[in-house]
């Protein structure tokens, strides 16, 4: 088992005077954990993640956090710059200074053929954005300690789901996956 990143003890939260969860929550997140947070709309999945990251304060209980880096990937993939083209986006993440042909090879692996390289990112579908983001993170080779993925497979076809699933499986850090799905 890995280093303890977050310990939440008897936490609860309320936007009003009532608490969000019927019973207080106890959670421990360790380095390398794969945690799948499921629930219906309004059940508090995103609120829980915001509490764990320190973006919200609990109404009850305590949360202790180690020092770690994280990347929250929302459904809009707002980490991407919508004004750049697909290829320009990969160049932006190219901290390893890969050659142009290597970038193009990686783009192809993530289902971005030549004819998509000049496409502006604001024109991409939700599935294309998440694929491009994972492609860029592979190119950047500077993954955070924790990935938080909010509904990463929404609007994806089966081939895209397989690519994203493989990328998540190959990632060695901690993954917090928020979804309605029980997969």
Where are these regions (language model features)?
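ABC ATP-binding cassette signature C-motif
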Residues: 2-183
């Amino acid at each position: 088992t890995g280093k303890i990143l977050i310990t939440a003890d008897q936490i609860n939260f309320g936007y009003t005077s009532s608490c969000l969860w019927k019973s207080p929550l106890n959670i421990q997140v360790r380095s390398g954990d794969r945690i799948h947070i499921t629930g219906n709309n309004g059940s508090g999945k995103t609120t829980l993640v915001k509490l764990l990251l320190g973006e919200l304060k609990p109404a009850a209980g305590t949360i202790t956090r180690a020092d770690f880096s994280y990347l929250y990937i929302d459904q809009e993939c707002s980490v991407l710059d919508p004004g750049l083209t697909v290829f320009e986006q990969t160049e932006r993440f190219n901290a390893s200074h890969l050659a142009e042909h290597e970038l193009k090879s990686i783009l192809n692996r993530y289902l971005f053929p030549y004819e998509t390289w000049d496409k502006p990112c604001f024109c991409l579908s939700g599935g294309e954005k998440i694929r491009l983001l994972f492609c860029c993170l592979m190119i950047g080779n500077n993954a955070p300690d924790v990935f938080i993925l909010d509904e990463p497979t929404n609007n994806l076809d089966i081939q895209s789901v397989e690519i994203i699933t493989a990328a998540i499986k190959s990632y060695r850090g901690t993954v917090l996956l928020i979804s309605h799905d029980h997969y």
